[in-house]
Swiss-Prot record:
Transmembrane segments: none
Keyword list, A-Z: Acetylation, ATP synthesis, ATP-binding, CF(1), Glycoprotein, Hydrogen ion transport, Ion transport, Magnesium, Membrane, Metal-binding, Mitochondrion, Mitochondrion inner membrane, Nucleotide-binding, Phosphoprotein, Transit peptide, Translocase, Transport
Leftover remarks: Binds calcium ions.
Subunit structure: Homotrimer. Component of the ATP synthase complex composed at least of ATP5F1A/subunit alpha, ATP5F1B/subunit beta, ATP5MC1/subunit c (homooctomer), MT-ATP6/subunit a, MT-ATP8/subunit 8, ATP5ME/subunit e, ATP5MF/subunit f, ATP5MG/subunit g, ATP5MK/subunit k, ATP5MJ/subunit j, ATP5F1C/subunit gamma, ATP5F1D/subunit delta, ATP5F1E/subunit epsilon, ATP5PF/subunit F6, ATP5PB/subunit b, ATP5PD/subunit d, ATP5PO/subunit OSCP.
A GO CC term assigned to this protein in UniProt: mitochondrial inner membrane
Species whose genome carries this gene: Rattus norvegicus
InterPro entries cross-referenced by the UniProt entry: AAA+_ATPase, ATP-synt_VA_C, ATP_synth_F1_bsu, ATPase_a/bsu_AS, ATPase_alpha/beta_chains, ATPase_F1/V1/A1_a/bsu_N, ATPase_F1/V1/A1_a/bsu_N_sf, ATPase_F1/V1/A1_a/bsu_nucl-bd
Positions contributing to phosphate binding: 209-213
Residues with N6-succinyllysine modification: 124, 133, 161, 259, 264, 522
Protein name according to UniProt: ATP synthase F(1) complex catalytic subunit beta, mitochondrial
GO molecular function term, any single one: ADP binding
Length: 529
């Protein structure tokens, strides 16, 4: 009888190892990836350390099984806690494993942060004694690192003495700031119609080729100039080519400076070809870099995550490898917890703020898919880039009617800003509803009032365009950063009819309204001569 029980237990354990028996993982459900270890607290320890690698622990184990990105390690003594980083010994390249489950019999199940090719059973593994720690501080600006903090830009080591664990708790309630404040971006259409809240989360929706990258670079540039703030770009499941292009475009536009220490952005990449463990953690690495600037330097940091869907997708792959029972549409059962644990760390404290702009891929354009639906619950604003607007040559191609913001409230932005924004949206909506009539009957059949609406709407549409500083090399137009007061004043005067006499092309690709007036005078001179 005992031998039968032993065989059943053995079969169950081996089935769990192969991922065949998801029920075998259930007793360890409370030990999964979603909780931070006891030693990790928002009051981070940024103490100087002498070497790039975190201080090693003493426990040594050996690999007993390798199933793709999942590696089981047995320790004779000193079992490492959940989320600890382990390092495989005797390899040329550094391979870090993160503890995900305790299986019993002194064995831990880990997720590899890099490829497991060449691993063999019996190989030695050392416990680092802490979660994955990465370099933080001003030295990370202008550099590209991977999920475990190694530089991947071929420019030597990141010379910082400060390291931080990628797992941390969200700031406590007493540390949070309750003030609602606009983060002025200097981009007219964003500041007027869908303003970003300091410490808020913005969803950036846009297909290929509508200007997502240029908008991201302009935001990085403007935040550095207007607020003196830094930015962090986390490429989660990105195409390597796109990440490479972005890096070189940033060098060309001056956002990254290779000659001196004036770079404004740190880059963290976990590309599409990386194992799921790396893609599931790289967003946390980027967030940790941003948290240092917020908590230690009191900065207003901009954190870009491209693409937040890949974070969820990687979590789903990891979950399946760990043998958990899948939830709706095959996603991990801890989807909401994984997302919430990360998103709650993106917030405003009394020291500074992290404002996050997250590119969101919507699978099969289905907004009810659990991955985007879970993300929407955390968003404060949405910026929708429209191909139809890009085709008109209006950049940034932000859709003024589809983009929304939670802080578009007269109690937060003020009644003047609110009234002007709603007035602009109303006139654009009226123009949209008149377009069918214009297409069939022509402009001549409209009433005088409707003709005026169309004329003003077309001027507003063009005035929502703006030359970007990072795109000067392509457009030949000098970039403009427009203060919020100037933006409100300009649109207010167009709505009031103060510029009904100016031609609509005068409003295209200008900064404040005074430039439109000057451009109209210049056009009149050219036509007069």
């Amino acid at each position: 009888m005992l031998s039968l029980v032993g065989r059943v237990a053995s079969a169950s354990a081996s089935g769990a190892l192969r991922g065949l028996n998801p029920l075998a993982a259930l007793p360890q459900a409370h030990l999964l990836l979603r909780t931070a270890p006891a030693g990790v607290h928002p009051a981070r320890d940024y103490a100087a350390q002498s070497s790039a690698a975190p201080k090693a622990g003493t426990a040594t184990g050996q690999i007993v099984a390798v199933i793709g990105a999942v590696v089981d390690v047995q320790f004779d003594e000193g079992l490492p806690p959940i989320l600890n980083a382990l390092e495989v010994q005797g390899r040329e390249s550094r391979l870090v494993l993160e503890v995900a489950q305790h299986l019993g019999e002194s064995t831990v199940r880990t997720i590899a942060m890099d490829g497991t090719e060449g691993l063999v059973r019996g190989q030695k593994v050392l416990d680092s004694g802490a979660p994955i720690k990465i370099p933080v501080g001003p030295e990370t600006l202008g550099r590209i690192m991977n999920v475990i903090g190694e530089p991947i830009d071929e420019r030597g080591p990141i010379k910082t003495k400060q390291f931080a664990p990628i797992h941390a708790e969200a700031p406590e309630f007493i540390e949070m700031s309750v003030e609602q404040e606009i983060l002025v971006t200097g981009i007219k259409v964003v500041d007027l119609l869908a303003p970003y809240a300091k410490g808020g989360k913005i969803g950036l929706f846009g297909g290929a080729g509508v200007g997502k990258t240029v908008l991201i670079m302009e935001l990085i540039n403007n935040v550095a100039k207007a607020h003196g703030g830094y930015s962090v770009f986390a490429g989660v499941g990105e195409r390597t080519r796109e990440g490479n292009d972005l890096y070189h475009e940033m060098i060309e536009s001056g956002v990254i400076n290779l000659k001196d220490a004036t770079s404004k952005v740190a880059l963290v990449y976990g590309q599409m070809n990386e194992p799921p463990g790396a893609r599931a953690r790289v967003a946390l690495t980027g967030l940790t870099v941003a948290e240092y600037f917020r908590d230690q330097e009191g900065q207003d940091v901009l954190l870009f995550i491209d693409n937040i869907f890949r974070f969820t997708q990687a979590g789903s792959e990891v979950s399946a490898l760990l043998g958990r029972i899948p939830s709706a549409v095959g996603y991990q059962p801890t989807l909401a917890t994984d997302m919430g644990t990360m998103q709650e760390r993106i917030t405003t404290t009394k020291k500074g703020s992290i404002t996050s702009v997250q590119a969101i891929y919507v699978p099969a354009d289905d907004l009810t898919d659990p991955a985007p639906a879970t993300t929407f619950a955390h968003l404060d604003a949405t910026t929708v880039l429209s191909r139809a607007i890009a085709e008109l040559g209006i950049y940034p191609a932000v859709d003024p009617l589809d983009s929304t913001s939670r802080i578009m409230d007269p109690n937060i932005v003020g009644s003047e800003h609110y009234d002007v924004a709603r007035g602009v949206q109303k006139i654009l909506q009226d123009y949209k509803s008149l377009q069918d009539i214009i297409a069939i009957l022509g402009m001549d059949e409209l009433s005088e009032e409707d003709k005026l609406t169309v004329s003003r709407a077309r001027k507003i549409q063009r005035f929502l365009s703006q030359p970007f500083q990072v795109a000067e090399v392509f457009t030949g137009h000098m970039g403009k950063l427009v203060p919020l007061k100037e933006t409100i004043k300009g649109f207010q005067q167009i709505l009031a009819g103060d510029y009904d006499h100016l031609p609509e092309q005068a409003f295209y690709m200008v900064g404040p309204i005074e430039e439109a007036v000057a451009k109209a005078d210049k056009l009149a001179e050219e036509h007069g001569s």
